[in-house]
Amino acid sequence: MERVELMSALEDRYQVDLNETNFANAATVGDLEKLLRDTSVASRQSLVVGKPSERPTTGDQRLTGLAFHYPRWTLRWPTTWLRLSSHYLLARPAVFLLGWPRVTGRENLRGVRGPLLVVSNHVSDVDVGFIQTALPARLRHKLATATGGEALERLRSPVPDRAWFKQIYDRVQWTLGVALLNLFPLPRQSGFRKSFAYAGEAVDRGYSVLVFPEGKHTTDGKLCPFRSGVGLLANNLRIPILPMRIDGLFEVKNAGKKFAAPGKIRVRIGKPVQFAPETDPEEIARALQSAVENL
């Protein structure tokens, strides 16, 4: 999320509205300076002419090669019922088979109805299943999960030179991911504003949002620094934030084991916290990292 932070800081400093895709393709300081100059000129021209400056769309997509997709059907009741059925029939039994988790801190959610911004450490691809299992049903049933936008979009739109059967497999993975896990893209380079807007729409519909602020799986079992983009998202959503932590899963994964003894994996739930509007994003990220570390 570092690009989110830098772009927001530049927009605040120079009072301009930067194009996300052009910003993502700026590789040097000189590129950024040129982008700022061009944007400032376009903004002044739009004020003189009396119409908003035009922004390229098709060219932008050619620059990045990706156009992120945010399907609204995943938030509607038919998909919700399908997702709940698959959770209780498939995902939940699989989690208990992998390692019956010991959940602590559920008392911190008494009387909490949501929606919440849920933040957790990131150990493996099955983290979402353990988080869902630990949450009470009222939150578990309406949870949207942010995931790497570029990787998710390449599943939806595989490269043309990829074998046809692999393309089909990729699209099936994308469909199952967004339908059964309610995944949505959180891009690393461009398109994050649409991602934030989608998260806001999900919250408006009563969904909690799960993010992994480290932005990657841990490689040593320790918590990686939280990126301050989570602070920007918190300021955008303005809802209580729930810190959670998964312990024991890294040791199982690192040992190359497929299953863990009951109680070996522990999911800890903290107390929901909330920050005043316009709190510095880096301060929010540090506070949330401390909250997760201290669980």
Describe the predicted segments one by one.
Residues 1-64:
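Phosphopantetheine-dependent thiolation modules in NRPS/PKS and related acyl-activating systems
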Residues 5, 126-130, 229-232:
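Short amphipathic alpha-helical face segments that pack within enzyme cores
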Residues 10, 118, 211:
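Conserved S/T- and glycine-rich ATP-binding loop of Class I adenylate-forming
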Residues 50-82, 149-169:
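Compositionally biased, charge-rich terminal segments
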Residues 74-98, 157-182, 193, 197, ...:
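Alpha-helical membrane-targeting segments
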Residues 91-122:
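Helix-to-loop junction immediately C-terminal to a conserved catalytic motif
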Residues 113-190:
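Catalytic core of membrane glycerolipid acyltransferases/transacylases, capturing the structured
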Residues 190-295:
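Non-catalytic C-terminal accessory region of glycerolipid acyltransferases
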